């Protein structure tokens, strides 16, 4: 039992890394490149089953807000993985879904059902910024 505890403790120490910006330690069981690859794969799979709006004022708004957030993330945390992300921001046509989400690597989606709730670009930017923090 002591050997197992020692081995587990060693594993936790070895897999810890420092979070840019906060300096806190976090436990990582996979590399950031593995996370980004998994995020990109999951993003493609999810979007296959959704109707993505590619043009129009709402899609342009999501893109513009997303690109501004991505630029800020790169500038604010230059030493973070945000500079390695292949940022994508999609608008999914689903009025019943009041949600947005982000996956590792900067893969982000906003549902059209969220737009009437947020009401303006500032509120949508706040929601998207929150989601991007999960990426």
Spans of features found by a protein language model:
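Positively charged n-region of N-terminal signal peptides that target proteins for export
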Residues: 1-4
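C-terminal motif of bacterial Sec signal peptides marking the signal peptidase cleavage site
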Residues: 12-15
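Peri-catalytic and regulatory segments of divalent metal-dependent proteins
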Residues: 17-133
């Amino acid at each position: 039992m002591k050997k197992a505890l020692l081995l587990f403790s060693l594993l936790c120490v070895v897999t810890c890394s420092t979070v840019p910006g906060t300096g806190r330690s976090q436990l990582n069981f996979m590399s950031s490149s593995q996370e980004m690859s998994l995020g990109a794969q999951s993003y493609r799979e999810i979007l296959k089953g959704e109707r993505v709006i590619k043009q129009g004022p709402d899609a342009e708004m999501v893109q513009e807000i997303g690109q501004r957030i991505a630029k800020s993330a790169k500038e604010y945390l230059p030493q973070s993985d945000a500079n390695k992300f292949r940022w994508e921001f999609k608008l999914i046509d689903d009025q019943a879904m009041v949600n947005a989400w982000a996956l590792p690597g900067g893969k982000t989606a906003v549902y059209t059902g969220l737009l009437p709730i947020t009401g303006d670009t500032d509120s949508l930017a706040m929601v998207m910024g929150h989601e991007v923090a999960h990426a």
